[in-house]
């Protein structure tokens, strides 16, 4: 009887420590209207990140690329997907494409971070994350708009570059199918960033891994930045 009670207790403990569900909207644009603004791998970046969380098996993933990445579709996807989250869950927006000060360049115009955060605030999830792989991504803090002190938001921002830097696409000859930031983000989320080998990648671990890899691979030309109001030990993924 004691053995049965002990086994039952262990079973309940295991249930209580199961990872919370992650709700992610992953979008990328390589093919912008016209030809001058096209990128090479941004659409694949979004597919790569969505694939990681889909394979994880504990995530609800929305992924769309190129002409599907309109302001309306992105906002609708975030509202519908993030609304499903409970307080113990996490919500994530991943974007790869062009950036502007204070926002993202969708297929049909600019989606400002203020709009993204407005939607995120409506979610019950306690863990909220934004990953952006775009040139001058860090410039989002340097807008002229009022009331844009995003560092006070309960959101982790992980941005591919400083405000004055370009986010590099990997050269064709390297064989990589992702931009430099997402190359290391993928490696980190698949276990490379798990320094203490506990099968959980935290915000601090993914930052350290990606930052070091990108800075070294770019020859000190690109420096990912992470900021916001969050716990550095916040789990990003259980792999």
Per-range role (PLM):
Residues 11-12:
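Repetitive helical segments and hydrophobic/amphipathic motifs
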